[in-house]
Every structure is written in C-alpha cells, then in structure tokens.
C-alpha cells in the first residue's frame, strides 16, 4: 500500500472537483441567460421567429445532453461511495455523506450540530437542487463544499453568532468622520474629506487594550501553531523576503487609492490620541499566514460576478456622477464607484477608524476580509479567489476593481458581518466613444457617465465630461521658417541600406555568373567540357549589364464588361445580399446577368495552386461555407489567413490560403456586382450600443435579406446609392425609428 499514490490521486481529484464546480456554475448561468432571452423575445415571435429556432434548439439539445451526463455522474458517485465505506464509527466521522464533518472542516471544526444544520439550510450553491429528506444521503460533495464559500455569508454569520456571545458586542468606532452628505458630488475626494477626520496614530500590532474589561475578544492569532504549521513556516522562511507588505502590489496602481484617505502626518500625534485609538501594525508579518480551510477557487471574472454590487445606483439611460476607481487597459475597461452615504462604514475602515481583529489564517476562498496597505496607511476590503501557480494567491480589491498578487505574509483583519455584507464599490464599466488609455489621468476624480446598458453585472457607458474629449496637448518642436514637419520628416527619413553595391544600385543581386558558363566559346557554341557542362552557354551582356531579368506577362486578350448606368430618380429592382449596418445594405441590380459562382468540380485541387503568393487587392476565388467558390478581393493579410471581401455579395470573411484559388483574367476583370445602398431619411442612432446593433442587424435580416424589391434611386453617393423603399417595405425606416435603432437625418 503506497500512500503517495493516494495523495497524488486525491490532489488530482480535488483539482477536478473545483473545475467541475466552476463549470457547472458558469453553465447554469449561461443557460438561465439564454432562457431569459428566449422568453423575452417570444413576445415578438412574429418578427423574430426564424432567429429563435436555432436558439431554442441549442437550449434543448444542450440541456438534454448535460442532464444525461449529470445523471451518469450521480450514479457513479453513488456506486463508488457504497464500495469504499469504512467502519460505522469511522464512516460517520469522515464520510462526505455526514454533513457535520465537512462543515466542521470548512468552518474551523465547529462541533455544534445545530450550527452545522443552520449552515446547510442557509447556504447552498445555486446549481444544487433541494432534495427530500429521504435522499439527503445522496447529495453530491459539491453541496457540502460550497456551504463554506457561498457569497451570501449568512451561514458564516450564524455560526459566528453562536460561537460566543462575546463576539456580539462590536467595539464602537474610535474616531467618527463628519457628515459627508453636504459635499458636492462634483468635487474630488480630498476636498470632501479634508479637515473632517481625526489623526490616527500608526503603531504596532492591533490589540484592543482600552476595552479589555468590557469587551474581551479572543484573537485567532493567540492560538499556538501546530507542529505541521511550524514545519511549513520554517520551510517558507528560507526563501521569504521581507518587503513593505501588500503595498508593493497595490501601489503599482496606487492611483486608485485616494491620497486623502491616507494619514498625512502619522508621527505628529498627541498622547491623548495614542490612548484613545489602538495602534495598527505598519510592517509586514514575520511569518506566513495559514492557508484557507475551505471555499471554492474561481477565476477573476467569476469572483467579480459572485460579489454583491449596488447595480441599482446606475440606472440605464441616465447620467450618473461617479468616481473613476481604476483603469484596466489590458481588459479595455474601467471601474467606477459611487461612494455615497451608504458607504460610510467602508470609509471608516479605509481611514482606520474602526478597531479590527488581526488574523493568522486566511479566510475561505471568496470570503471578504481586510488587508493593511502599510505605505498608504489604509485598510481596504479584499478577497482571494484562487491560489497562484508560482506561490501565493490571486486576490481582488472589491472596492477598487484591482486584481493583485497576495504573498501570504501580509497583515489581515477580520471584518464585522455588517461591513462584509455591504455591496462592493467597484463596478466594471465598458466605456465607449473614448480612449481607455487616456483615462488614467482622471482616476480618483468624479466623472459623469451616460449609462447605456446595465445587465446587473457590467455597465456600458459613455463619458460626457467635456475635458475627456479635449485633445491632449503635445510638445511641438519649432522648426526654421519655411520648413514644415513633413519636410523635416522627409530629410530625416533613412531607408534600410545594404553593403552590397549591386543590390544598392539595381535593387537585387544578379546571378549571371552563377548561371552562365565562364568558358563559353562562341566559335564552338559551347566550352571544353562538352555536354558535361551544366551552365548556360551564352555570352555575357556587354558593358557589365545583366541578363537576369524577369519578363512581364503580356496583357490578357479579353472583352471588358461595362457597368449598367441607372438614372437617378428611376425605379429599379435590386436583390439584398448582405446587411452591413442599421442603415446600410449591400445588394445587386436585377439586370438579368447570370450569377458568378463556381462549384468544387469547376475548381479542382490542381487549379488551386498559386504561382506566387496572393497580394493585397488581388481578385481570387474564395470557398464559402456552402461549398461553392465566389469572387473575392484580398483586403488584408495575416500570418495564417487572409481577410477577403466578396465583390458580388458584400460580406467580409477570414479564410486560410487553402480556401483560395486563382481567378482567371476573363472573370477577374468583370465589374463588381454588389453595390452599397443607404436608406433615405435616417442615420445610425448615436446611443446605439453593440448589443443593440446586433439586434438591429438581425431584425433587418428577417425583413430584407435575400429579398427582391423595387426601390427608388434618390441620389448617387461616393460609395453607393441613396434609396427609398417602396410597396411593402416603405415602413422599414419608421420601424427602425420606433425601435431606437436609428434617428432622423438632418
């Protein structure tokens, strides 16, 4: 019997269980979202019936297949648990069927069965259904593990209240800030809080000394470490480097920590202040924190979605004043915070006005606690979502929207339950019509945003402050009179050079000497080697010229077609082939021309080889998803694929080189069949979001795509025609206006 094999298998089992839990949660969320969208769109079934069929089929097929696999998994769990049962006493103490044992290990070995029952009743994962009492023994292990890491924190608060009545009395705040409701929302933070806070001294480790008699609190830091923990800490101390605490991570983006929330003069304090306020530690810990006992590891996106946020403070189609908390250029988003009167308790924690209990062990994954920033002298709320591959943990500052690395030797504190349950201040915001990279200069200032979309998790907004749209001033270089910047750029332009004089003069290196025989004799029309010579027997070009040239191909003999000219003001027939936007479509004139399409039999494999690599703007034959080839023009080139435009239908695709074939001159010189048509009287709505744009395109597809109709040519545009719909389609512009997809053109 090898215990190392069992340990490795157990580690693999735990890792797979965490992945399974995360996948089940994300899958359930996605299916509920699809079901919600399907239910909402059923009210417009007459308009979107065709587009709802694939959505309905996908939902039914996916749920059926996943349900089958889940049922098989439950059966396998039941079979395997029946086969590995221990003795009666041992099984009751260690089995996963015993809810008390798992909850006891996840919540610091609480031995009260009543507390364990409260936990099981008050917290369970969203994807686990309620089972009857007769089948409670078959509840998967997921339900037990998740009981200690749920977002609600209700079960944890119940256990904490039942542990000891001593914890019910929360120490009163030692310094109270003045009323902040009188501040103007357009002022920055330092103007709001200036002069309203008492100075708080910074000292050694936190111990509530002034209220020991009335409010004793048992500190988890006072518990002696076990022999296993001591050996673990001793091994880690060999590579531990004492820095300045978590501030090394937070200070990389310290602009998201307002300077006014820091203590300006921590050394200039009176004796009365020192006696009044308990000192907080400023330096990092000398030993590592114990790892979390429970919880579920999640991704960065999942931990953000799990945390409670006050999304109701940002209603749609309104202008809201908020603080720009941080900017994430890599994810192309920003985080905004309201910081209104409902966050006063969070501000007191941030300003170190509340006595907190220091912890020696990290809370469960997903649990909210506080951490000390020793450089900025602030305490902020934080949660850890997963362990890092290189050591430490991935953590998330819930009030500033920053993901940081947590070493495990920081100074952390336990938060009161009421502060834990307060919504997170940082809310993800996808800003449109602005450059995210230029938003760093507005961090920690109030900005006004127009909220276009609020999906209860993320905002889609647009900044409306004038200074955000002002161009940044750049230092211009003064040039002598009469010389412009373009002239100086032309003078300073130095092309790539070469040390080969032939390549510098001709642009290439001739290969005459490598190709022509040096012993060629015109009288013999050969050389002394006879037929054994492998070089070309011809004279060199006179005067050092070269014969190494490539002849251009002759012009093809073909008949060029001309485009049909249509008179402005006439009524013509068109076929809509592609919807390019809310007010623009692509189509063909119905002039009786046969369609330009090639079957795979017309383009066999031996005809799909290019003599040279295709270049930009070349006309080629491109394979479409229906198995046929159509004319296309190369408009961009990438390492493994090409971006092409179907010149006869108007759609754009990305295809590899294997899906392209040469197009003969007789076909490539024919005029493009597709034209751009703009709808008269309307333009794209300024407030149209990306999601609304997709909805508008789907709506126009159901109405216009692959439809032949008569239209009135109103005007010739540089890139197409301005048309007016007739007959059954004349109400299309009005319907687009009613749905807020477009607005009246001026």
UniProtKB/Swiss-Prot annotation:
Widely expressed in female germline cells, including differentiating germ cells in germarium and egg chambers (at protein level). A zinc finger (C3H1-type) spans 511-540. Its main location: cytoplasm. Residues 1-310 are annotated as: Involved in homooligomerization. Pfam families: TUDOR (PF00567), Tudor_krimper_1st (PF24047). One of its GO terms (cellular component) is P granule. Residues 613-670 form the Tudor domain. Disruption phenotype: Females are sterile due to defective oogenesis; defects in germ cell meiotic progression and loss of dorso-ventral oocyte polarity. Oocyte nucleus fails to form a compact karyosome by stage 3 of oogenesis. Precocious translation of osk mRNA prior to stage 9 of oogenesis, probably due to defective RNA silencing. GO terms for molecular function: zinc ion binding. It is found in: Cytoplasm; Cytoplasm, Perinuclear region; Cytoplasm, Cytoplasmic ribonucleoprotein granule. Residues 311-489 are annotated as: Non-canonical tudor domain. SMART domains: TUDOR. Disulfide bonds: none annotated. GO terms for biological process: negative regulation of oskar mRNA translation; oocyte dorsal/ventral axis specification; oocyte karyosome formation; secondary piRNA processing; transposable element silencing by piRNA-mediated mRNA destabilization. Keywords: Cytoplasm, Differentiation, Metal-binding, Oogenesis, Zinc, Zinc-finger. Belongs to the Tudor domain containing protein family. Possesses two tudor domains, a C-terminal canonical tudor domain and a central non-canonical tudor domain. Both tudor domains can interact with Piwi proteins allowing the simultaneous binding of aub and AGO3; this brings them in close proximity to facilitate their role in ping-pong ampification of piRNAs. The canonical tudor domain possesses a hydrophobic pocket that preferentially binds methylated aub; the interaction requires symmetrical methylation on at least one aub N-terminal arginine. Stable structural component of the perinuclear meiotic nuage, a germline-specific subcellular membraneless ribonucleoprotein compartment involved in production of transposable element-repressing Piwi-interacting RNA (piRNA)-induced silencing complexes (piRISCs), which are essential for maintaining germline integrity during oogenesis. Scaffold component of the ping-pong piRNA processing (4P) complex that recruits the Piwi proteins aub and AGO3 to specific subregions of the nuage where it coordinates their activity in the ping-pong amplification step of secondary piRNA biogenesis. Homooligomerizes (via N-terminus). Component of the ping-pong piRNA processing (4P) complex consisting of krimp, aub and AGO3; a single molecule of krimp can bind both aub and AGO3 without the need for homooligomerization. Interacts (via canonical tudor domain) with aub (via N-terminus when symmetrically dimethylated on arginine residues). Interacts (via non-canonical tudor domain) with AGO3 (via N-terminus when unmethylated on arginine residues); this interaction leads to symmetrical dimethylation on AGO3 arginine residues and its subsequent dissociation from krimp. This is Tudor domain-containing protein krimp. The lineage of its organism: Eukaryota, Metazoa, Ecdysozoa, Arthropoda, Hexapoda. The gene is krimp.
